[in-house]
């Protein structure tokens, strides 16, 4: 399975005129949340609402601020939690954001594929 990157824009949910410039992020289906540089998020007025702990691939536990933003990439959009990444942290587009976009990842074609909406219940009268 190959990896690829996309440009992500984060939008302030309280003031949608405030956005980040496009941020190149690795599409990472192994990461639950999206990680974007803290300074770039803060420049758009996006603020942390709490601090969460994360376990790295090396088993180290780290703490990072987490907030909410509208995330856009490749023509898709969702509101999601975003981790305020520190220098040295990877910039990642996580699986929850991908689920919010309602896409699957075509890792061979290096693109997102829109999923069909699933109707949970349908009654035809």
PLM regions and their residue ranges:
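Pepsin/retropepsin-fold aspartyl endopeptidases
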Residues: 1-125
